[in-house]
Structure formats: structure tokens, C-alpha cells
């Protein structure tokens, strides 16, 4: 066991995880089955486009639509494709605490570099805290606390209690809204005892989050390489230039949906399928949506170093 800032920490092949961790959308074929080739392509895209880590499946990956067997099976798919190039964080959120623990155990058995979970819906903070204790009973590596509205959110002092109690809790994804203020709250309590506080919200508030103590963010992966550029420029000290790039990207983040994510990944030659597991309804992209997206993509073309945007079909 390592000691991190005076705290006995967990074992992991990645000593420290921070930066931009891309969240993989789950691709489907015409029959609604997980499309392995596209999932592999998305994982490889994250590796090749300079992202700092991979997370699957969380909200972006529609964990709530995935069966237990296919979720565990495709953790193996993602890890096989990544091949140790980046840390892979396994999303363990579920419909019950027992299911979360099942996924945490699968992460241990299959060698996930970290696991992340938020409490099941319609539970409370005490159940959430017990859930992380039970995860630590079956998983030896670093655990990420995902603190989100509507999923038994924890107060800053409760997050600090978990950090004190559980050696494996080395990371926090703080996304109670307003995110930057809550990141500042958690940073003031545990910033010297965790390795990274991640933000969320698709990177919408990335500069403000970094300014308040975050060392990373977990956005959907389809444009996360641009967020990597923002992150790197910010860490290099040119904060105004980082904000300029962020202002160019922000209109695209603001219209992000699951159909949008799949569409961008297809435009970048990553996904072959735009299929949804459930009907997208009003979120389905129409011709006007695609024209607007194309206009907004032109603004960030020079910020994209690989996987350029292909023409709309």
C-alpha cells in the first residue's frame, strides 16, 4: 500500500490519474445490441486523440440500459482495446447497492484501473456512504466517489468522512450544481488528501472548475480532445488563451445529447452506427440540427489535431 499525502492509499498501475477522462457512449447495432467494433473504435479514439483516461459506462454510456452480463463482458472489450495505454475506469452505478457491489467485484476480477459509482436513485446519503464501504470490501484499487444531484448527493463533510475512512477513496467526481462552487467546497476539505477532484457537466464549466481546485474533468469523449487542449494550455499558464478555446467549444457542449455524441463520433470516423437503444424522440437530430452543428464545428476545426470532421451524409 502507498501513502498519499500522509494517507495510506490503494494499489494501482497508474500512480496518479488526472486530466480529461473521456466518457464512452455505448454504440448499438440495428437490433439494439452493443456494437463491439464501434465501442473498440471509441476506446482507441480516446487513446489516439490525447485524452488522459477512459470511463465506461456512466450516464454518457447509458449504464441504465445495459444488462449485467453485457456490461461486464464489454468492460473486457474496452480493456482489451486500450491495452494499458490509458487508465480505464469502470462505471459501477446500478439500480441497487448490491448491483453496484457486483460491478465493483467485476472490476477487481478483471483488473479495472479504477471504479466509479454514484448511489442508486431514491436512496439517501447514509446508504450512499455504506455503498462506498461495501465497494472497498471487494475492490482493492482506487475508488472514485461520484457526487451528483438526484443520486443521494453527499455534503462536503460527508465526502471528507469517506476519504478519512476508506484508503481506496483517492478521487472525487464532484458534479452537484453549481459545479464550480461545490468543487471549491470539496477541495477546501479534501484537496490535500485526494489525488484529483474531477468536474463534470460535459466540460461546460472547465475553466472555472480548474480555477477552484479541480485537476480534471470527465466529459463525453467525442470532443474531449479539444478539452485536453484547453486543459494543457491552462496548466501551461496561458489562461486567457484556454478561455478563448473554451468559448469556441461551448456552443457545441451546450447542445450535447446522446444522438449528438453519436453523430459527432460518426463525423470523425469513429462510429459506424447512429442507432439508439430506445427511441430518441425530440432529441433526434433533424436536418436543421445537422446544419447548425456543421457551422459550429467549423469554428473549432483548427483545435482538432486528429480525427478531422468528415462531411455529413
Q: Model segments located where?
A:
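Short, Lys/Arg-enriched N-terminal segments with co-localized hydrophobic residues
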Residues: 1-10
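Active-site beta->alpha loop and helix N-cap motifs at the rims of alpha/beta catalytic domains
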Residues: 13-152
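Residue-level recognition of short, well-ordered coil/turn positions
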Residues: 33, 51, 112, 167, ...
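A general structural signal for well-ordered alpha-helical segments in protein cores
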Residues: 39, 75, 100, 132, ...
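Structured C-terminal cap/extension of enzyme domains
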Residues: 47, 207-313
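Short secondary-structure transition/capping segments
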Residues: 66-69, 126-131, 156-158, 211, ...
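Short helix-capping segments at alpha-helix termini
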Residues: 80-86, 110-111, 139-141, 164-168, ...
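Catalytic alpha/beta core domains of metabolic enzymes, predominantly
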Residues: 149-257
